[in-house]
Amino acid sequence: MKKRLTLSLNQELSKNLLKTKIDVLVVGVSEGRTLNSIAEKVDKATQGSIKKLIKRGEFESKVGQTAYIATNDGTSAERIFLIGCGKPMKGLSSEDLDKIAMSVTTCLTTKKSSTGIVSLPSMKHESKENTDETLLQKIGTAVESKAYTYDAKLNKKNKKINYLKKVSIVIDSRQSVAKLRKGLKTGQVIGQGMNVAKDLANLPGNVCTPSYLATSSRSAANKYQKLSCRVYGEKEMKKMGMDCLLSVGNGSAQESKLISMNYQGGKKGDKPYAIVGKGITFDTGGISLKPPPTMDEMKFDMCGAASVIATMQVVSELKLPINIVGVVASAENMPGSKATKPGDVVRTMSGKTVEILNTDAEGRLVLADALTYVERFEPRSVVDIATLTGAVIMALGYSTSGLMSNNDKLAEELLEAGRKASDRAWQLPLWDVYQKDLDSNFADIANIGGRAGTITAACFLSRFAEKYPWAHLDVAGTASYKGAAKGGSGRPVPLLSQYLIDKS
C-alpha cells in the first residue's frame, strides 16, 4: 500500500519544539487557566497569545475547537494552531476523540503545509476502550486519509499535489511509547487501506473492469507472504453452478469474475472470518435501465469490492494472527441482446431459483452465489459489503451505513467496531414479516420485495447465509461522496479493519 506521508511519534521533540523548523505547529490545550508545559512555552514565545485568547473568551478549549495565533521570531513554525481538548478531569468520549482527530487533521491540511508537529496534553478518557493509543489511531487514520489525492487519469500539468509530507506527534501520556506507536501505525495503515479503496472506486468504468479488480487483487497478494489469491472465470463459475452471478454480466462484453483472497495469519486449520464484496464495476441497471442523470456515479457500484480488497491488504500489513477470506463477486451490468430480462428465472449455486423482476437489483444476485461459495471455508462469521439500495440513503442519509444480521452478537461487534473506528453503522430489523415480500409465483424467491427496500434486499441475502453468522452492510450512502467532493470515501474499510483487529 502507498504511504502518502511520514507519520511518527517523537516524544523527544518536546525539548526543542520551538526551534524545529516546520510549516505548522498544532498545540492541544485543555480547558482552564493552567497550560501544560508545551503550551506554556508556546504562550511565552508568542507574547502570551494563548492566555490572551482564553482571557478574552475567544478560545475556550472546548473539544475540537480551533484557533490561529500569529507567529514571531520566538518560534520556527510558519503557522500555529490551537485545538481544544476539553476539561482535563472529565473523561473524553469516543466522539470527543473523533473531534480532536478531525481538528488536528484540518489544521495540518488547511494551508499548503509540508511538515507539521502536533503536541497533545494529558487527557482523561471516559472508558477503558478510549485511550491515548485510541486517539493516535484515529489521528493516524484521519491524517493519512486526508492526504489522499486522485490523479491517476490526469494530465501531468493538472496533477494534484499532496503537500503534507511529514508529521511528528508529541503527547503527554502515561501509556507506553510502544502502545502509542502501535496505535499511530495501526491508524495510518487503516488510512492507507481507505486510500486503496478510493483509488479503485475513482477509476472510470472503462478501466476498472472485473478483470482489473482481479489483476489488482493478484498484485496485492504478491506483496504479502501470507496472502494468496485465486480468480474464477465464467467457465469455472458455470461449472460451480453460479448462474445467478453470471446472469448479471450476460449483456456485457466484460467477463465476470469471482475473486477469492486468502490471508493465513492464524494457525493452520483455524476457521477464518470472511468478508464478501459486491463488485459491479458499472451498473446501467441492465434492461431495467437507470435514468441518465448521475449514471456516471454507477462506477462506484464496486465500492463493496474495493473495501474487501483494501481490508485484506490492511490485515496483511498489520500481520493479524487470524485467518481471513475476502471474496469479490464482480460483473458489469449492461443492456444488450444477451442481457437478462425482467421475468427471467435463474438457478443459484445453492440450488434455489430466483425470478429477476428488476435487473437493476443485481447486486444481491452476485452476492447470493458468493455467499454460497464461502460456505466451503466454514467461516466463523461472514460480513458482506455492498452499495445495495438507494433506500438506505432515504433511511440513514450519507453518514451512516445500514447493518442487518442474523446474529445479534455479530451485529453488536460490528456496531462497536464502527464506533471505535469513527465509521458508524445503524442496525435495521431483519424480521420474518419482511420475508414474505419476496414470494414469487414462478421461482423460489423474487429479487425485489416491498417498500422497505433495504430490509427486503437483506432478507434476500439472508436466504443464502443460513449456515453461518452473517451480517450485511449497505454502504450505498457512505462509500462515496456526492457533489463537488465526488469520489470514493474509503468506507467501510475502518469498520471492517477494526472488527478484524478486535477478533485477533
Please describe what each predicted stretch is.
Residues 58, 115, 197, 213-504:
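A generic structural signal for tightly packed, nonpolar segments enriched in small/aliphatic residues
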Residues 1-279:
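Short amphipathic alpha-helical segment within the helicase RecA-like ATPase core
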